[in-house]
């Protein structure tokens, strides 16, 4: 699910680097074939920072908390190729590296050699641009950008995994296996931060939350055509779970406990502890 970068400009809410020249999201300004489905292609990648800023309520606040969590749970439990102790972190479904950049932001307080970050995404368009942005902004940090499907991707031992707005794009039948692989890779004391669009299971509550979400998008400049176009394109592509389903699944794969630490309309972020 993840804001991106360029040199010196900062987003006022998230305090992470963003592109100086904003490419506005106009993907759905013209009617699309009803059979068209949303994908993270070059057109989406080009406007992704604007798209996620205007489409995901609370996104900047969620990113800003990642280094705070990392400071508490990254224990330098791994050894890098140079024999130095580091904390390995995975950013799964990294998109343009927003979560990775949030961790490395100067306010996070991590030194250049304290974290080893592996950023993984299935979209070649995303990883190609993410690699450029991360290299431009954090050339001296230990970051590896990997193009891969996180299903079946082998994780090395790590202290923290970030799964932001990603699980929701996987078939429901594949989600437990992905979480199991994350749990197995985490060291004791490690955490998973899981952020997802959700639903409550109550028809009336969900209808209200969805309409307020569309109001949020209208307030951010999206037209009715854009809102309906993206809704249609995401049908059967983005499939939400309830918070209860998420927490039950986390318990099933072995996490000691999990909690919802942030919620804004129908978006929520959870942390699971090993």
Swiss-Prot record:
InterPro entries recorded: CmoA (IPR005271), Methyltransf_25 (IPR041698), SAM-dependent_MTases_sf (IPR029063)
Binding sites annotated in the UniProt record for S-adenosyl-L-methionine: 59, 93-95, 149-150, 164, 231
CDD domains named among the record's database cross-references: AdoMet_MTases
Regions annotated as coiled coil: none
GO molecular function per UniProt: carboxyl- or carbamoyltransferase activity; S-adenosyl-L-methionine binding
Entry keyword annotation includes Calcium: no
EC number: 2.1.3.-
Gene3D superfamilies linked to this entry: Vaccinia Virus protein VP39
Keywords for the protein's UniProt record, in alphabetical order: S-adenosyl-L-methionine, Transferase
Biological process terms in GO annotation: tRNA wobble uridine modification
Top-level taxon of the source organism: Bacteria
Function description: Catalyzes the conversion of S-adenosyl-L-methionine (SAM) to carboxy-S-adenosyl-L-methionine (Cx-SAM).
PANTHER family per the UniProt record, alphabetical: CARBOXY-S-ADENOSYL-L-METHIONINE SYNTHASE (PTHR43861:SF2), TRANS-ACONITATE 2-METHYLTRANSFERASE-RELATED (PTHR43861)
Oligomeric and partner information: Homodimer.
NCBIfam families: carboxy-S-adenosyl-L-methionine synthase CmoA
Protein name per its UniProtKB record: Carboxy-S-adenosyl-L-methionine synthase
Source organism: Psychrobacter sp. (strain PRwf-1)
Organism taxonomic ancestry: Bacteria, Pseudomonadati, Pseudomonadota, Gammaproteobacteria, Moraxellales
Gene coding for it: cmoA
């Amino acid at each position: 699910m993840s804001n991106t970068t360029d040199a010196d400009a900062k987003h006022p809410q998230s305090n992470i680097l963003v592109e100086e020249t904003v490419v506005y999201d106009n993907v759905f300004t013209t009617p699309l074939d009803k059979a068209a489905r949303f994908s993270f292609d070059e057109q989406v990648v080009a406007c992704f920072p604007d798209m996620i800023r205007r489409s995901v309520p609370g996104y900047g606040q969620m990113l800003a908390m990642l280094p705070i969590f990392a400071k508490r749970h990254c224990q330098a439990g791994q050894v890098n190729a140079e024999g130095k102790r580091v904390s390995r972190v995975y950013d799964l479904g990294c998109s343009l590296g927003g979560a990775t950049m949030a961790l490395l932001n100067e306010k996070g307080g991590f030194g250049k050699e304290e974290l080893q970050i592996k950023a993984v995404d299935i979209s070649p368009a995303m990883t190609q641009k993410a690699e450029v942005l991360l290299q431009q902004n954090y050339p001296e940090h230990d970051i590896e950008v990997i193009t891969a499907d996180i299903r079946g991707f082998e994780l090395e031992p790590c202290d923290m995994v970030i799964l932001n707005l990603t699980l929701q794009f996987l078939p429901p039948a594949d989600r437990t296996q992905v979480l199991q692989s994350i749990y197995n890779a985490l060291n004791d004391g490690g955490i998973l931060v899981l952020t997802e669009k959700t639903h409550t299971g109550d028809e009336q509550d969900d209808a209200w939350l969805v309409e307020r979400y569309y109001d949020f998008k209208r307030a951010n400049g999206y037209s009715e055509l854009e809102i309906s176009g993206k809704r249609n394109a995401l049908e059967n592509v983005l499939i939400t779970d309830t918070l209860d389903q998420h927490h039950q699944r986390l318990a099933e794969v072995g996490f000691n406990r999990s909690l919802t630490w942030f919620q804004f309309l129908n978006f929520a972020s959870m942390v699971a502890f090993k």
